[in-house]
Amino acid sequence: MTEELNGRRIVVPEARELGQLVRMLEERGAEAIPCPMIAIRDAPDAEPVAAWLRWFVKGTCDDLVLMTGEGLRRLLGLALRTDLEPAFLDALRTTRKITRGPKPVRALREIGLDADIPADEPTTDGIITAMRRHDLSGRSVGVQLNPGNPNRRLVDFIEAAGAVPYPVLPYVYVSEADDARVLAIISDMAAGQFDAIAFTSAPQARRLRDVARATGRDADLLQGFRRIVVAAVGRSSRQSLKRLACK
């Protein structure tokens, strides 16, 4: 691994764990080029999330669908700031927890809890498949949503199963690096100035695409993808890149 990365120039679009990824690559001899595409922020209007927390701590939530580890951590953070953390943790312990993929499982373990129903695969379809095995009739189901995805398919499934969904969106994505920096990365990719780019989330790829489209640089972006190695962590990242014509 060290020999494979020695001297390689690798673009890192990550924001939250940027320092860790840069150190990991540099320890293996690579030159990491940071360009954080997306930052994660608490929902700008905290009141709907706080209202959801007040409902949740009443203990009337039967099931909680956790799409991401970040979602649980953001809920915990707001619970702490609103003096609801003990009640929130108590309610979590007695609520059946349904998780999509390893990240929400990891976030639960950080607070000494486990998933009760892990999805068959880390997708909405995987969650629905897992939930079909259980009678949901009459149950109250909290649903932690992802930014930009109201997930009507999951919400509709829950309603069709006779349950009542209670969605919550605890965080949002915002642009991090300015457009000029992103455009410079696109130009250098097209020119073959890098060896690889490593995506850790779908929103990173979408930001790159959006900047390219807005500036008429789609062809440069596709050329860049074809000239360098494109790495993706996680299924959603891979799917986003496939839609951008990456193999």
Spell out what each predicted region is:
Residues 1-247:
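Signature of uroporphyrinogen-III synthase
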